[in-house]
């Protein structure tokens, strides 16, 4: 009855009129984060210079084959001015969670959306990328044209975007769109 997906992909469904007009609800933002193998030293990535040094010191770096990984590969390394220096030690992980490969010891550092990193055992979540280097994926939902229960679908989306659902959404590594933003920067 509802679809929940990356906002850009949902826009395509809306354009094709496969969702009920006006039913789109912005739900959550998904930032990129980093993990290390459980028990490994936890590096500092809290600032842009610290992230840069961490990447330069690492023996191996993994990133996903999704949008977050494409960002790491095509933009993050370049923004940090280290794309040439990390090229040979940075690897795209296809079709499986990056954190699972870090947990096995195949890579020192792993980058993916935080919500994909947190549930994987055997790793330590280091943190999100610094704000200046962050890449956010927005998730949204809408009621489908073929919904058997469109009113219940609208109610579900309303609940998922409410303050009552915010703590559960936050626990998964997502940032609810309904959450207050820190504007003091």
Give short role names for the model-derived ranges.
Residues 1, 6-16, 20-21, 25-30, ...:
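Exported/periplasmic ABC-transporter solute-binding proteins
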């Amino acid at each position: 009855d509802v679809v929940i997906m990356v906002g850009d992909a949902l826009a395509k469904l809306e354009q094709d009129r496969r969702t009920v007009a006006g039913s789109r609800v912005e739900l959550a933002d998904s930032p990129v984060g980093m993990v290390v193998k459980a028990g490994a030293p936890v590096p500092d990535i809290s600032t842009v210079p610290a992230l840069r040094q961490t990447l330069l010191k690492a023996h191996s770096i993994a990133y996903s084959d999704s949008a977050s990984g494409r960002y790491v590969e095509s933009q993050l390394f370049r923004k940090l001015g280290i794309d040439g220096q990390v090229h040979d030690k940075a690897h795209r992980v296809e079709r499986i969670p990056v954190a699972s490969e870090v947990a096995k010891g195949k890579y020192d550092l792993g980058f993916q959306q935080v919500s994909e990193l947190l549930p994987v055992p055997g790793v330590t979540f280091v943190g999100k990328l610094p704000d200046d280097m962050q890449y956010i994926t927005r998730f949204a939902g809408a009621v489908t044209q073929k919904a058997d229960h469109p009113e219940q679908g609208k109610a579900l989306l309303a609940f998922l975007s409410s303050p009552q659902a915010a703590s559960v959404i936050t626990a998964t590594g997502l940032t609810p769109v309904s959450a207050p933003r820190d504007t003091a920067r």
